[in-house]
């Protein structure tokens, strides 16, 4: 049975994943924004769980980070018990 997520959960997952993908690729917020053709404040807001990025923005960020929008929105894997 699927678990339901709140908007806050989704924003937190997105923030964590974008930051993680960005850091794994050694890219600053500014560089990511420049190469994805979005404003740097957009990346900052996403990583701070502020605002509501458009699908267009998510696609641009996912493309630059060599991943998918689904991966950016994915909840964390459950910790083994």
Q: Where in the sequence are the language-model features?
A:
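Short basic helix-loop element that most often maps to the first helix and adjoining turn
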Residues: 16-35
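A detector for short, charged/polar N-terminal pre-domain segments
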Residues: 1-13
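Conserved hydrophobic/aromatic packing and binding residues within compact polymer-binding modules
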Residues: 18, 32-33, 43-46, 72
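Helix-turn-helix DNA-binding elements, focusing on the entry/boundary residues of the two helices
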Residues: 18, 29, 40, 55-58
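DNA major-groove recognition helix of helix-turn-helix/homeodomain DNA-binding modules
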Residues: 56-71
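Recognition helix of helix-turn-helix/homeodomain-like DNA-binding domains
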Residues: 37-51
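Short, charged recognition helix plus adjacent turn
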Residues: 2-3, 73-81
């Amino acid at each position: 049975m699927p678990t339901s997520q709140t908007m806050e959960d989704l924003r937190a997952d997105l923030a964590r994943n974008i930051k993680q993908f960005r850091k794994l690729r050694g890219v600053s917020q500014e560089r990511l924004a420049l190469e994805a053709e979005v404003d740097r404040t957009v990346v900052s807001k996403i990583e701070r769980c502020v605002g509501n990025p458009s699908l267009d923005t998510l696609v641009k960020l996912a493309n630059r980070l060599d991943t998918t929008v689904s991966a950016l929105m994915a909840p964390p894997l459950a910790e083994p018990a």
